Structure formats: C-alpha cells, structure tokens
Amino acid sequence: MTNNKTYFVANWKMHGSLNSVNSIQNVIKLSKKAKYKNVRIVYCPPYTLIRQFVEKTKKTKIDIGAQNCHFENKFGSFTGSVNANMIKNIGSKFVIIGHSENRANGDTNKSINLKIKSAIKANLKVIFCFGETLKEKRNKKTNKVIAYQIKKGLHKIRNIKNIFFAYEPVWSIGTGIIPKINELDKQVREIKKITKTKMRKFSTEVQ
C-alpha cells in the first residue's frame, strides 16, 4: 500500500497488563503536534488488551492492530486461536501476519497466505512481514528468499491496497548487527521491484 503518510508500528509482543493501557496518553499528546500530521501510529498489543486500547484511542491518529490471526474466519474447534472477524469485531483495524517469530513457531508461506486472505475478507489492513535469515544473507539469497515469500504470501491475492509490506531482516534481530541505512534503502527498492513484478497485472498500488 502506498500513500503520503508514514506509519510507525509498535508490536508489544507478549507484554502488557491493564495498567499498561494508560501509557498511551503520552503518545496521543505527541501525535497531535503539527509536525506529525502525516504520521500514523499503529499499536499492536496482546489480544487481551486490544479492546482497552481501542477505547483509549478513539478520535486520535492512533490505530490498533492484532499480532496474528487464525486463517479460518468461521467459529470452530481451534483452541487458543482468534480469527480475523473476531479481531475486527472488537475494534482492531490492523493485523500483523508473517512475523519472523510466528514463522519460527510454525507459520508457513501457505498458512500466511490463508491468513492474509482471511484478514482482507474481514476488512482488516495487513502488515505483511517477510525477511531473510543471517545464513540466507551470507549466502547472498536475500532477494530470492524475499521474492519467494512475497509470491507465496500473496498467491491468488489481487487487491493489495490494504497490505503494508514490512521488511523484517531476521539476521538483525537479537544479534547486535544493525543494518545500514543505505543497505535498507537498497533492499526497499528491490522489494518494490519484486512487488511491482508480482502484482503488475492486478494492481497499480505499489509505487
């Protein structure tokens, strides 16, 4: 998705309690400043706090998202799972799909594709994560890996206007290796090229 706004996404992971919700007040005040008029903030707390954050952020420039969803949109026997419709129903506007930690815990390109389809059907905006490992980077497979993840993740998806492409260099997470700005710029350009090639016949949203 492209527009003239800058998005900052705060993934809370498995952190936070009811007492944490009030911490957003300072961010709300900051977001009202004129210099941040083109900035949107997305908070992605645990499921247990989504509703509370939704209530706190009404009539602000802060949106609330979930950190994952099940690929099945109907109710069913999926213990411990939450689907996209349930997330949407409590006020969430975004959902993170394909995060490296979830990939490491069993998410596949196939399940990610099904989750994205499910989220789009529920009218959620998708933060689609992808990225290469340190081994893949060292073997100079970055572009190949990313192209494959994007291709499989967006299989048979024609409308990408509500998909945010989130490059997540797995090799920099917890390793102390910080990617250089020019390195990230180069990779973002490559990702745009990949997405344009993949979606050219379906959409003109990628710029």
Regions found by a protein language model. Give the residues of each.
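Active-site loop-to-helix "anion-binding N-cap" substructures in soluble metabolic enzymes
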Residues: 1-207
